[in-house]
Amino acid sequence: MKVKGSLKSHRNRDKNCKVVKRGGKVYIINKVKPRCKARQGS
């Protein structure tokens, strides 16, 4: 999983990318391409 400062460009990488909030953190998940996963953090 990649840790990015901003997920804006990351969520447009694939049409199956979804933005989810879990436990106060923002994640990008993709069930079709799991290698597109990312978490927002500084």
UniProtKB/Swiss-Prot annotation:
<dbReference type="GO" id="GO:0003735">
    <property type="term" value="F:structural constituent of ribosome"/>
</dbReference>
<dbReference type="InterPro" id="IPR047621">
    <property type="entry name" value="Ribosomal_L36_bact"/>
</dbReference>
<dbReference type="Pfam" id="PF00444">
    <property type="entry name" value="Ribosomal_L36"/>
</dbReference>
<dbReference type="InterPro" id="IPR000473">
    <property type="entry name" value="Ribosomal_bL36"/>
</dbReference>
<dbReference type="InterPro" id="IPR035977">
    <property type="entry name" value="Ribosomal_bL36_sp"/>
</dbReference>
<keyword id="KW-0689">Ribosomal protein</keyword>
<protein>
    <recommendedName>
        <fullName>Large ribosomal subunit protein bL36</fullName>
    </recommendedName>
</protein>
<comment type="similarity">
    <text>Belongs to the bacterial ribosomal protein bL36 family.</text>
</comment>
<dbReference type="GO" id="GO:1990904">
    <property type="term" value="C:ribonucleoprotein complex"/>
</dbReference>
<dbReference type="GO" id="GO:0006412">
    <property type="term" value="P:translation"/>
</dbReference>
<keyword id="KW-0687">Ribonucleoprotein</keyword>
<dbReference type="GO" id="GO:0005840">
    <property type="term" value="C:ribosome"/>
</dbReference>
